[in-house]
């Protein structure tokens, strides 16, 4: 195990950025989101949750898939280049690390999404344990340990800096790259104390009593026609804020854009909460807010576990708890349906 001081952290980040793209929490106008490192970036490793998750690193909000050009009556198709160089994602919280596993189930199942797969192959994830969990956190509900982040490299906040531990071969290679800024040290006691403090705080969170009894594999018939869906969905605005801030939502649309010199076919995030989501000539899209609202939460808590060995499509990050203008989030749904211990 190694230690990196707060004073040396900027040098370490600069060293990484010199060798590869570096994606990390950056503050801009008081708002912290993941962005690319630059020399004048206001790096923020203290804010617990970025407004948006680091999902963009592997599943961008918008990306070109291929382009079509026509010259002299000849049409050419040029696929977008796949990621072929290593890059690092720094300061990822344990819930967001688990979210990558959820996305893997979607994009790496056969036939694998080549764009996502290339990014996953070359991406190096450096996680950071949650020194001070917030009231909106409920990751423990889904079996996530905020004190034990799973990634290529795991970090914990300790006195005067951070403990650093490589967990995978990719993590070890990154460690070798920045070894000049690390001090090898036995931090077992300090890290264990930090883990215990984090777990104690998590147990005190307002949503630590959530129970998933009645959800999960095989619960479709039990939950689908529950009259509470109507009561809950009546307050939903269908704004889609929850889906765009969620680290596990994977819905997207594919569109064509005429540049005047050719056509780009691109993929962009979409929301199952929108009335025109998956709209087709046959009219198969869900026509009511009740249907759309139910679909979102049934997918996360029933359908996804049904098809993915019991894995839920929620990681308890709490972003929807904080962002929904109606305070109508997955915690409220679970509780209203009886999900408390």
Predicted regions and their residues:
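Iron-sulfur-associated redox domains of electron-transfer enzymes in respiratory
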Residues: 1-219
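General structural feature for long, well-ordered alpha-helical segments within catalytic domains
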Residues: 8-12, 242, 268, 329
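Alpha-helix boundary/capping residues
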Residues: 16, 104, 236, 337-340
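Short alpha-helical basic/polar micro-motif
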Residues: 93, 240, 244, 322
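Active-site-flanking alpha-helical
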Residues: 100, 247-251, 325
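Ferredoxin-type iron-sulfur electron-transfer modules in oxidoreductases and energy-metabolism complexes
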Residues: 211-234, 252-341
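Basic (Lys/Arg-enriched) interaction patch that binds polyanionic ligands
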Residues: 233-253
């Amino acid at each position: 195990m190694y230690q990196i001081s707060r004073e040396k952290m900027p040098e370490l980040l600069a060293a990484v950025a010199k060798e590869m793209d570096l994606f990390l929490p950056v503050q801009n106008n008081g708002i912290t989101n993941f962005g690319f490192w630059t020399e004048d970036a206001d790096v923020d490793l203290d804010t617990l949750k970025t407004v948006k998750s680091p999902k963009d690193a592997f599943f961008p909000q918008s990306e070109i898939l291929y382009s079509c050009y026509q010259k002299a009556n000849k049409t050419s198709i040029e696929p977008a280049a796949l990621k072929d160089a290593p890059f690092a994602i720094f300061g990822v919280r344990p819930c967001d690390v688990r979210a990558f596993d959820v996305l893997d189930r979607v994009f790496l199942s056969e036939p694998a999404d080549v764009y996502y797969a290339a990014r996953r192959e070359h991406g190096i994830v450096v996680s950071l344990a949650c020194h001070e969990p917030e009231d909106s956190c409920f990751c423990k509900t889904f079996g996530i340990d905020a004190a034990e982040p799973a990634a290529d490299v795991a970090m914990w906040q300790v006195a005067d800096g951070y403990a650093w531990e490589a967990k995978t071969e990719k993590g070890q290679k990154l460690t070798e790259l920045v070894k000049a800024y690390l001090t090898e040290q036995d931090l077992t006691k300090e890290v264990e104390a930090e883990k215990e403090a984090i777990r104690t705080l998590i147990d005190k969170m307002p949503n630590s009593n959530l129970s998933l009894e009645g959800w999960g594999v095989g619960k479709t018939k039990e939950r689908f026609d529950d009259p509470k869906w109507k009561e809950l969905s009546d307050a939903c605005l269908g704004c889609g804020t929850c889906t765009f801030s969620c680290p596990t939502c994977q819905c997207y649309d594919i569109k064509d854009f005429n540049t005047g010199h050719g056509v780009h076919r691109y993929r962009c995030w979409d929301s199952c909460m929108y009335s025109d989501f998956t709209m087709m000539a046959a009219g198969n899209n869900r026509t009511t807010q009740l249907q759309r609202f139910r679909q979102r939460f049934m997918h996360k808590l029933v359908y996804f576990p049904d098809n993915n060995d019991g894995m839920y499509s929620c990681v308890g990050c709490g972003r929807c708890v904080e962002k929904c203008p109606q305070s109508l989030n997955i915690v409220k749904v679970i509780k209203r349906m009886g999900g408390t211990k």
